[in-house]
Amino acid sequence: MKRELLLEKIDELKEIMPWYVLEYYQSKLSVPYSFTTLYEYLKEYRRFLEWLLDSGVANCHHIAEIELSVLENLTKKDMEAFILYLRERPLLNANTRQNGVSQTTINRTLSALSSLFKYLTEEVENADGEPYFYRNVMKKVSTKKKKETLASRAENIKQKLFLGNETIEFLEYIDCEYQNKLSKRALAFFNKNKERDLAIIALLLASGVRLSEAVNLDLKDINLNVMVIDVTRKGGKRDSVNVASFAKPYLANYLDIRKNRYKAENQDIALFLSEYRGVPNRIDASSVEKMVAKYSQDFKVRVTPHKLRHTLATRLYDATKSQVLVSHQLGHASTQVTDLYTHIVNDEQKNALDKL
């Protein structure tokens, strides 16, 4: 979603929110949470607050009128009723006969609510230096995680990774072969953004940064001489990330054409730009997701930018056998989340041995 449209939608949601949600929003901007994250959270709050009205838990007409005391006095049974509502409500405008949202969506909703309740009961201060209330019902609500072993997850994921030579082959396919099947109109659009698209995909494959970290890069954040980028990690922490050398020519080619191709001025600080009606803007995450899906589906299998992050992590672990190094590269505080890559690499090694 374009940044301007995203901000418009955020403003629309803010207009209907209670004052304490607006305070939460303002507080998280300073962390900083991304606008995309805050937009998703606001949508979850609207859904929850509307349910409070519809179910009669809150006795008012508009969600902006819901008092803090309603949240303070929510019971575990109330939250269980809300979760049941999510599980059973019909899906609207969906190409499915299934009722209810997925467990992943429910977990995301509960995570957003946990963040709000933690703010209200622990982080915010009233005039006396105390939180607005102390009773946090979300601490009594447990989430149900998808049951899947690491081995099973590794097996599912590795089919969507570009391991070994496929990393370079994917980039070369976009560079040299993808255009051969395009119409004249599609070819013109491809040629306009070819260097940028290759630079973004090469960077994701060569650094393992998150999509949000990549699109939020500014021109000053990249140093091609030492192949390092400075990113803002989750929680607002700044980090320097090494970039594999194979991405250098793609990044250099893009930087050579960036100013003239996208009509960039000094005030256009974003590294990766798009252009609409002659005006350059920071490229948005949605555009990158669609771009990665388009190229990857034509090459091998449709993947997300996050699978490119998995690809880098798996290749790095395969080369170093160091979970610590991989966790540092990905910006994780713990090596626990890198266990997945050991399973993927071990499976690859077993397959190689079976061919001997």
From Swiss-Prot:
Residues 169-354 form the Tyr recombinase domain. One of its GO terms (molecular function) is tyrosine-based site-specific recombinase activity. Residues 16-121 form the Core-binding (CB) domain. One of its GO terms (biological process) is DNA recombination. SUPFAM superfamilies: DNA breaking-rejoining enzymes. The keyword ATP-binding does not apply. The active site is at 210, 234, 306, 309, 332, 341 (o-(3'-phospho-dna)-tyrosine intermediate). Belongs to the 'phage' integrase family. XerS subfamily. Pfam families: Phage_int_SAM_1, Phage_integrase. It is found in: Cytoplasm. This is Tyrosine recombinase XerS. Gene3D superfamilies: 1.10.150.130, Intergrase catalytic core (1.10.443.10). Keywords: Cell cycle, Cell division, Chromosome partition, Cytoplasm, DNA integration, DNA recombination, DNA-binding. One of its GO terms (cellular component) is cytoplasm. Site-specific tyrosine recombinase, which acts by catalyzing the cutting and rejoining of the recombining DNA molecules. Essential to convert dimers of the bacterial chromosome into monomers to permit their segregation at cell division. FtsK is required for recombination.
